[in-house]
């Protein structure tokens, strides 16, 4: 008897009803509104979807396995390629997990923590502006796309001025940050923060009460609270279903317990409610950054943790002190050796809970590296979310989930 091929894609074993009234349609993986390499197999009765099966894997790069074959510092730039719209969030989540594994989280200098938080919240604004621009364009609002990219460009210029990269930042290091803020950077940041609230009002003026926008989003993609919990939704996908949960509040990291901000929640449970949350979250990020600016000015100019067994010394010390040079050589050529143990660290990325699980056996590279990416779960929910809707609503629903395939196909 012929043995079944275990690598056979599971969707080929799905049974679709074939009759004169139903048809099976492929949505993607080259569809411009698929937000990456998403393929949906849709069974349709006329224009109405009766069954939906997401098919992923078109961007798979073996990222977790790559992480298990690299020393810890080598893998950090690779995390940029997950959610490439918010690269700093990936860098930071991995760095924080390694720091907690090493036991040096509390040794990270306060200035480094402030800089990290500014970059994280600026990255959140960039990600939300990109979401709003592309989502509005998918639904047909061309002008909003242009306005959002204008403000996003200014924020990306700020990031570029700090780390030299526009998209894949690598702006965080295990143990701190590589650079202090450039001279005049905070002044330019203040100009941006003063201008952005008026621009958010402009976007809302174009969309919030727009009749077509509301018709396309209201009562579309409804996620009841129970469904959100069953599918492990997080971020705005969870808060948009009336569940108040934000890791920055529930399990504070860095200095989030020292800043004052609100958690926007909506009980609408639909795409329109999630849109309202994205707008409010940008305002909360502005509020957080405004509190961080005076905190930065009060800190000492130290950027990296002092942990010689894991973290290289300052460049000046490496060039002038024999011991620092030898330690640096060992760390670069062989890598740090964390103690035996395991850790899972969740963070609140712009799209939801981004967490890293690391299992160490005392070697310079992880024994096991597992990435918990929010977009993976938010893609899975489509099979329950799409049936009952019409084909025209598919683009709206995919847009409201805010998925990116760099972190789905790892």
From Swiss-Prot:
It comes from the Bacteria. It catalyses: a quinone + NADH + 5 H(+)(in) = a quinol + NAD(+) + 4 H(+)(out). It is a peripheral membrane protein. Its main location: membrane. Its EC number is 7.1.1.-. The keyword Cell membrane applies. It is found in: Cell inner membrane. Gene3D superfamilies: Cytochrome-c3 Hydrogenase, chain B. GO terms for cellular component: plasma membrane. One of its GO terms (molecular function) is NADH:ubiquinone reductase (non-electrogenic) activity. Pfam families: Complex1_49kDa. Keywords: Cell inner membrane, Cell membrane, Membrane, NAD, Quinone, Translocase, Transport, Ubiquinone. InterPro entries: NADH_Q_OxRdtase_suD (IPR001135), NDH1_su_D/H (IPR022885), NiFe-Hase_large (IPR029014). NDH-1 shuttles electrons from NADH, via FMN and iron-sulfur (Fe-S) centers, to quinones in the respiratory chain. The immediate electron acceptor for the enzyme in this species is believed to be ubiquinone. Couples the redox reaction to proton translocation (for every two electrons transferred, four hydrogen ions are translocated across the cytoplasmic membrane), and thus conserves the redox energy in a proton gradient. PANTHER family: NADH DEHYDROGENASE [UBIQUINONE] IRON-SULFUR PROTEIN 2, MITOCHONDRIAL, NADH-UBIQUINONE OXIDOREDUCTASE 49 KDA SUBUNIT. NDH-1 is composed of 14 different subunits. Subunits NuoB, C, D, E, F, and G constitute the peripheral sector of the complex. HAMAP family: NDH1_NuoD (MF_01358). Belongs to the complex I 49 kDa subunit family. This is NADH-quinone oxidoreductase subunit D. It comes from Nitratiruptor sp. (strain SB155-2).
